[in-house]
A protein has these predicted regions:
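Core catalytic lobe of class I
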Residues: 1-184
Length: 184
């Protein structure tokens, strides 16, 4: 990101690692544990520098990172123009009497209020979780979720940056909707 020119992309749409800090069946995924908050601060500062319009930053507040997520929201409160909720209709159930985490946040950052391409756009999207997830990565975002944001808040030929490109969901949806994309 430091190599990108100021205001060189129209939008950013990305989902950083969760920072699970667990030694379970997903232990081989290299989430950033030690400096997770600082990583997100650095990334958001760079995205604010390179993005002309809005940043859609998908983040999940779980048991391990909840305090850091709320700190992040506080630190960027002047740049956050909206917060959208992705409600999962079939989330992974919690064990015992623990509360099932059924939502993820989309922090929307920018210098101006967010306007939709459609009328009556809600700040909540409800979908099932991705049942066709590859074995190597069990948390791939559904294309429906990316399509919701990209179709409603960007226009054809806009350049969309995803700095945590992963399996390329942003690219697939951008191409389908005639947007340009950069994935790193």
């Amino acid at each position: 990101l430091p190599l990108f020119a100021n205001k060189s992309v129209d939008y950013s749409f990305t989902s950083p690692p969760y920072n699970r800090k667990r030694n379970d069946k997903y232990r081989d995924f290299t989430d950033i544990n030690e400096n997770w908050l600082q990583l997100n601060i650095d990334v958001l500062n760079q995205l604010l520098r390179v993005t002309k319009k809005h940043i859609f930053y998908n983040i999940q507040a779980n048991y391990y990172n909840r305090q850091d997520v709320y700190k992040l929201i506080g630190l960027f409160s002047k740049s956050i123009v909206d917060i959208h909720i992705w409600e999962k209709s079939n989330p992974m159930p919690a064990s015992g009497k623990n509360i099932t985490n059924a939502v993820e946040y989309f922090l929307v950052l920018g210098n101006e209020s967010l306007k939709s391409n459609t009328t009556y756009t809600k700040n909540i999207i409800t979908t099932s979780v991705n049942s066709n997830m590859p074995k190597e990565h069990k948390a791939v975002m559904k294309t429906d979720v990316a399509e919701h944001f990209i179709s409603k808040f960007t226009n054809e030929n806009d350049i969309i940056l995803d700095c945590f490109f992963g399996y390329g969901t942003t690219g697939v949806v951008s191409k389908k909707l005639n947007r340009l994309f950069i994935g790193i």
